[in-house]
Amino acid sequence: MTDVPEPVRKCASLLKGTKSDTEKFAALFMVTKLVKGKDCNAAGKKLLFEAIGFPFLKKLLVSKDLPNDCPPLVYKSVALSILTCFCQEEELATHKDIIDAIPTLLEIVEQADDEDYEDNLIVVSEAYSCLKSIASHEPGQQALLATGAIPKMSQIYSAQSFQTDEALHLIVLLVKQFGVVSWPEDPTAFHALIQRIALDMETDDTERKYELCRILADILITCRREIVINSLEGQIWPESLFKGCGDILKAKIGPKQRDPALHLIATTLHVLGIQWAFMDEQKTFFLQLLQLGAIEVRMQMDEKKLETTFKQAELLTCCFSILEHCIEYMATDQLDLEPKEKQTTYTALKGAFNQVLAVLTRVSQDKIRESSNPKDKKFVFAIVKVLSAWLAQETTAMRPAIYKLLPFMLKVANESFQELKTWRAGTREGEPPIDVLRIMLPALCHFAVEEEARRVLFTHKQDEVLLESLEFYFSIAHWKRPPIPRAERLKRMNEPDPVPTPEQQAEMKVARSAIVALCNILMNFTVLEPKKAEDGPTFANLLKFVVENLPELKDTPDNLVIHGNLAVLGLLLLKQQSKKVKQNDFSICRYIQATIRFLWDAYNIDESNDPTALVVSIAYKGYWSDLSELWFLGMQTMCGVLPLVPWLSEFALESGWAEGIVKTLKKVKIGTLPANVKSAYEDFLSQLVDVNGDVQAVLKKADALRVCRNHRMMDLGKKLFGD
């Protein structure tokens, strides 16, 4: 009590001695003056808060049963004025009574109206001040989230009532804290809010336009992306953002305007994808983005001190994100560029990535590479990520420098992968860390076929990390329903089977893509490093993983491409490790059945309009660009495996596959069987005949003679019937 000023002590004593609400209210005018004075410290405010008693302040805020000598608004105004001062102290702003008053404060701001007379607007302003102070501390933030403050504030801003900027700043403060969980599953409030801000940004020609860019970026990045994308029909805010950002890119602007615009563009591309850049069905905006991103990267990374470059981390990360989206889209060959545009684009990108490479090389040799500062670490991740995106497309340039830098890039990528694994194994708070290794996989596909790069990869035991990554992403793609506690099983028996959430489905899609890239790299390793594939413990573990997990994979259209990749990877590994395979190994038996199913189901005549034409099956047709080469490689590798593991031929016979091939080809019209398909089937059947004495009789019974004649299968004919 000694540090409480004397006037404050006297006032507190007076308040405690009051015998009626009227007396207490009269004393409050003295409190108002005191708490706003410079002499009233935190201890003094706490003493006054306790002397008044929160129930009395709340009564002034909400009760209609008050003395008639003042209008209710005056009571409310005095109470809020005092509360605002109290809330400036953390101990009081986080006090249970004040936290419990949040719904009352929200109600006051929700009822605001531009038409309200001035006194009411002062009340609303004070209520916002209280909410802002409460939102500055963790207990208040949690309470605001729980009471639905974000959708309510969104509604206030969308309706454009009084002091809506206060509502907007509260929203930004909260969404920055809570991220995705800020928003309910119903995206209505989110769409309404973004539409209002986007329209304001599009039509505003003052500096506020750029402030709104920053606010839009901060809010957009926290959305429930899958839900928002699936509910975009009828929404016009993507178009407002497109027009607003387009106007900014055309204007003469400085860094103060350009930086928030780039921030918003990068975030919008992250949420809506690259198609947003083609909303007017022209390529101008896309090319402007690419040029601006590349120029900014060159300027910010050009021969500066590393500390200076790292200070621009946020801006550069946005530019990297824009360039990654542009590069990924250009790789799809959907962009029709004139020769001059191609040259300009390539020159811009090459200039930018020469700087990126130079900076990353300096980072790899500087003490900053060991920095424990999360922002520095995140920026290094971002540099490796964007360079990896470029190297996935640029497969020849800068090779000596890249090989030299590759160990550092792998170290960074592997570290980010371990961070993601740890995050998923824990409570999963906040945004998931970005797996730079996953982004690097397409570039590693190229490195896997380059001898020098492959040497670096094996020296740094990257094959072990890639197997770990395959196991990790398979666990995500192979979604299993959460286990039900034993005590609840009976009452939940009739519940429908749970399905993955939209967020989980998005994760599964990313995981499947990673598995395909990982299989590609590991296949190249297996073929190009046969000795390691035969003797290396990592490759033994890899085969074990494939044969145990492929049969478990759900038979769904989404899984077909990873099924094919794992099946063929397994065959390549079986071929190299054939000496170690034990006859009738149960897991190998199950694996080979799953592999036969993949190879068998690719072609048929049942689904053809012409009953004499062999066609790719409907299930495979939509994915055939990804499966065609795999299927031929699978058939070819099966031919290589059979002489080494002859007992596998039993499965081709017992399953009816060998007989099925002959019966199908028998119905195919002469001269219509594609040469590569004919070779694949003929080589396979010939190998079966060579390794298994029972095959001849089965094929002859199925009328293999006619098939050999019709489709000119000379080699198979000789094996079955002699010359």
From Swiss-Prot:
GO cellular component terms, semicolon-separated: dendrite; neuronal cell body
Tissue and organ distribution: Expressed in both somatic and visceral musculature.
Family matches, as Pfam families: Neurochondrin
GO biological process: muscle system process; neuron projection development; regulation of neuronal synaptic plasticity
Domain of life of the organism encoding this protein: Eukaryota
InterPro entries: ARM-like (IPR011989), ARM-type_fold (IPR016024), Neurochondrin (IPR008709)
PANTHER family tied to this protein: NEUROCHONDRIN (PTHR13109:SF7)
Role summary: Strongly up-regulated in Mhc mutants suggesting a role in muscle function.
Similarity-based family: Belongs to the neurochondrin family.
Protein name: Neurochondrin homolog
Organism: Drosophila melanogaster (Fruit fly)
